[in-house]
Curated annotation (Swiss-Prot):
Gene from which this protein is expressed: CCT3
Residues modified as N-acetylmethionine: 1
Binding residues for Mg(2+): 93
Modified residues (Phosphothreonine): 430, 459
The protein's name in its UniProt record: T-complex protein 1 subunit gamma
């Protein structure tokens, strides 16, 4: 039987790689992704300019925003990009560090795989190290008083210093803190801070960044439906609808056969009566403003205008929800079911202004707004987009601290403290596992090392003295000053990071490294059609998965 030709199990147009080749390929892909955004860490970080497929320009130093725009082929690189997105959604900050750490964890593992150490041994050491990293972090964390605004501004400032918005840091910190405190909502002892839904960022090009502010209420890009309606109302009574003030057409197509001329007049009269009834149901409650998600017919506008009611139509559902939270109104589906307690009376002012070429409706001075709008002004769209990304990060940091008021020192100090603890612990370990365990400590040093590199200081000299510093008693808050590249005590410098962000960064980085080390086989399949097309000179990537 030995002379027979081999049996092909896999289809001929699939490509298979296995063993060491796959592992080193995965590690190299992860290292490449980490190298792309290595220069984006710290206050002296560089920015990247990316062209998206539509020809738009993105200028940013936010790890997640950069990787979102990059097109990659390798599956391991795709999973690296995925973790930065997860980090952004979970805690909103630390997207750059998580990629750099994961890349470094894999990089130090390569040496052991070359020495024929089994990946499972490396993985089990990494898992042990992760548990110890988490316990060490909790040991060095300190509680924070969230009612102390100076401390809160300081924490947000640590996050903003590394961003493009750092020139206007005090303005940005105040905006982030005010916005998050405004949307904070406590119910049955449970805190809810939903920034995505209730803190909307509106960007209007023009003016200067210093004109940006937080509105105690909502701003929408809409004008009144009829030019003679009021555009300035104090203490407005607001009614919110999600139904249209138009004549309802039947669900399916209906034909009406008319035999007499009067019947046609009667049909038109019925339409008018229906709309009049809708408007009367609304007018009974004496509102000043009616806002609906659907359309308002000309006739309805006429009735509302005669009753001196301002109407705004086709408002987004998300905006309507925010207005409801801000002024205490309820969104009603049928005008005939409107009651007095559905009317929102919490707003202090409704005003429609023209900014540039467009009209904007401002519902502000709300008594107890649980929703807000951040109005950003700036020179160009690119700058505004970057400022918005930075603000989102700052708000997430603020939210994390309010939900879990624990802090750890920034500037690479926590990494060095954890690395020192792991190195000490590894001395008591026996067997092969101690080497990969110690390598995790070595991998953690990549954060302070990158900070030093990015501000152009001498890496070897500073890292050695930082290691020496951490061997002394009560020196776990010493780290790198990213501005000057010198060693400082983070307590004095006031650079703190939320514990939640650090924990998530470490967990995600180690889990990703473990996941990629577990892979020993990659089978990539292509559809036959795509291959045929590329042979004929068609689109090379058509039909490929």
């Amino acid at each position: 039987m030995m002379g027979h030709r081999p049996v092909l199990v896999l289809s001929q147009n699939t490509k298979r790689e296995s063993g060491r080749k796959v592992q080193s390929g995965n590690i190299n892909a992860a290292k490449t992704i980490a190298d792309i955004i290595r220069t984006c860490l710290g206050p002296k970080s560089m920015m990247k300019m990316l062209l998206d497929p539509m020809g738009g320009i993105v200028m940013t130093n936010d790890g997640n925003a950069i990787l979102r725009e990059i097109q990659v082929q390798h599956p391991a690189a795709k999973s690296m990009i995925e973790i930065s997105r997860t980090q952004d959604e979970e805690v909103g900050d630390g997207t750059t560090s998580v990629i750099i750490l994961a890349g470094e964890m894999l990089s130090v593992a390569e040496h052991f795989l070359e020495q024929q150490m089994h990946p499972t041994v490396v993985i089990s050491a990494y898992r042990k190290a992760l548990d110890d990293m988490i316990s060490t972090l909790k040991k060095i964390s300190i509680p924070v008083d969230i009612s102390d605004s100076d401390m809160m501004l300081n924490i947000i400032n640590s996050s903003i210093t590394t961003k493009a918005i750092s020139r206007w840091s005090s303005l940005a910190c105040n905006i982030a803190l005010d916005a998050v405190k405004m949307v904070q909502f406590e119910e049955n002892g449970r805190k809810e801070i939903d920034i995505k839904k209730y803190a909307r960022v509106e960007k209007i090009p023009g003016g200067i960044i210093e004109d940006s502010c937080v509105l105690r209420g909502v701003m929408i890009n809409k004008d009144v439906t009829h030019p003679r309606m009021r555009r300035y109302i104090k203490n407005p009574r607001i009614v919110l609808l999600d139904s249209s003030l138009e004549y309802k057409k039947g669900e399916s197509q209906t034909d009406i056969e008319i035999t007499r001329e009067e019947d046609f007049t009667r049909i038109l009269q019925m339409e008018e009566e229906y709309i009049q009834q809708l408007c009367e149901d609304i007018i009974q409650l004496k509102p000043d403003v009616v806002i609906t998600e659907k359309g308002i017919s000309d006739l309805a506008q006429h009735y509302l205008m005669r009753a001196n009611i301002t109407a705004i139509r086709r408002v987004r559902k998300t905006d309507n929800n925010r207005i409801a939270r801000a002024c205490g109104a309820r969104i009603v589906s049928r005008p005939e079911e409107l009651r007095e307690d559905d009317v929102g009376t919490g707003a202090g002012l409704l005003e429609i202004k023209k900014i540039g070429d467009e009209y904007f409706t401002f519902i502000t001075d709300c008594k107890d707004p649980k929703a807000c709008t951040i109005l950003l002004r700036g020179a160009s769209k690119e700058i505004l987009s970057e400022v918005e990304r930075n603000l989102q990060d700052a708000m997430q940091v603020c939210r994390n601290v309010l939900l879990d008021p624990q802090l750890v020192p920034g500037g690479g100090a926590s990494e060095m403290a954890v690395a020192h603890a792991l190195t000490e612990k590894s001395k008591a370990m026996t067997g092969v596992e101690q080497w990969p365990y110690r390598a995790v400590a070595q991998a953690l040093e990549v954060i302070p090392r990158t900070l030093i590199q990015n501000c152009g200081a001498s890496t070897i000299r500073l890292l050695t003295s930082l290691r020496a510093k951490h061997t002394q008693e009560n020196c776990e808050t010493w780290g790198v000053n990213g501005e000057t590249g010198t060693l400082v005590d983070m307590k004095e410098l006031g650079i703190w990071e939320p514990l939640a962000v650090k924990l998530q960064t470490y967990k995600t980085a180690v889990e990703t490294a473990v996941l990629l080390l577990r892979i020993d086989d990659i089978v990539s399949g292509h559809k036959k059609k795509g291959d045929d097309q590329s042979r004929q000179g068609g689109a090379p990537d058509a039909g490929q998965e």
